[in-house]
Amino acid sequence: MTEGSDGKTIDGMSLKRIENLIDALKDESYQPKPARRTYIPKKNGNMRPLGIPSIDDKLVQEVLRMLLEAIYEGSFENISHGFRPKRSCHTALIQVQKNFTAAKWFIEGDIEGFFDNINHDVLIGILKERIADDRFIRLMWKFLKAGYIEDWTFHRTYSGTPQGGIISPILANIYLDKLDKYMKEYACQFDRGDRRAMNLEYKRYSRKIWWLGTKLKQTEDKDTRKELIDAIKQHQKNRMHLPSVDEMDEGYRRIKYVRYADDFIIGVIGSKSDCEAIKEDIKNFLGEKLKLTLSEEKTLITHGNRKAKFLGYEIYVRPFTDKTLRGEKSGVLIKAYGKKVVLEVPMFTMRDKLLYYEAMEIHQFEGKAKWKPTSRTKLLHLDDLEILDAYNREIRGFANYFSIANNSSHLNSFKYIMQYSLYKTFARKYSTTARKIIAKYRHHKDFAVFYEDKKGGKKMRVFFNGSFKRKTTAMDASCDYVANTIFNTTVSSLIQRLKAGKCELCGATENIEIHHVKRLKDLKGKEPWKIQMIGRQRKTLAVCIPCHNKIHHGIID
């Protein structure tokens, strides 16, 4: 159970504690605690600060989040995908893939230290545009100014959203919704022309086809007709591989914009000088209206046929020849030229992830880098099932995130390294060889670990054997929108169980509070409270104070 800065956890939560919280909110005596700062590793090797709020602050923030979502969610723009219901990185990427097909340039947006640099005065001003409740605004001010504790020292916060706060994501969306609406208005001013001018070469072939078709109607000679038909087919074939419009038409401009949290990408049909002007305008808007800084170095302008980066993917536009595009009735080839946005998982991302997991080493051989699977020292203390689960979880998570990549089959390389790293980890754990481990754990075609469940039944779990077939829609790929999990149950469910006023162990009806465990799999033994929690697959149990004390002292019947 993770403690906040006040040392409290959800364990011991009761209706009385909630009622005291409500009273403090009513008389405005409630004061958020400073978050306890810790650090988690970033993928680039640096450390990211993370604030852990108190459990009371988590409760209050969850209520605030629900209120803010009810007020703002319906007014957010369709191009915003971060931290929103039924939206994800995948929905953002698929929107790029559908809407950026004609882009000549990409602008990769990067805001310097966004979450730490949200201006409090600007944020409160934005909230006041929709919220007239002064008590709500004063409470928001308290959270923004709550600060954090690091190495037993209190630090004030002068900018940014609550450290590790549940409300931080929606506050970020409310803040950057101003940018979204600015870009929507900007597109209306920037866009020019109803359609591109026709490609002159395409037009020339069309005229030849029309002229030959006219002659064909006037000719009855079989040989002449055959020659004309062959010529028409050849011209049609040549025309199919050309764009029907002039892709360099200066009279036609478009801009497309997609954002996920503080990452955004812009597709531009226009010139590079147009892109430079757009970048400068966004920089000025962010600085003047939102007091944010657009990174000059990281906000890149990339040609459409070169790889831009967005949400961990590499993105570029390429022509394609699709000879399956035929008329529904005639079966005649009607179009063979087009462009599409390609999403790819970068090889360097696979490399960095495998190195981060310490699942491989890189050796130089004849001037080339060779990836070599290796055992993982940090997993050796785990049992067989825990090691297998760790590998499966890592492979599944990585494969799921990159499942919409056009080159998703490259994930087989990732799986191969992880698979042989697993073999070597088992081999090192048992002081044997990978070959012997494979023979020992093979079950049919799978690598399998057998174990007993809580009831003593024999179970089997196998190494990841899923497919890396590309998913084409966000509905196929798991959504990465993370629900706010203060508890494993919802706040309302927890409060309802407290309001029921009955101990779930002995049936007592007074002084009910919540017992909480960190992980269900750590529960061993046949005590009634453990059986109940395991049976319900629930980390929380509503119990009376005497039963709760007995649980903690290990003396419950």
Task: Describe the role of every protein-language-model region.
Residues 1-557:
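Non-catalytic terminal/accessory segments
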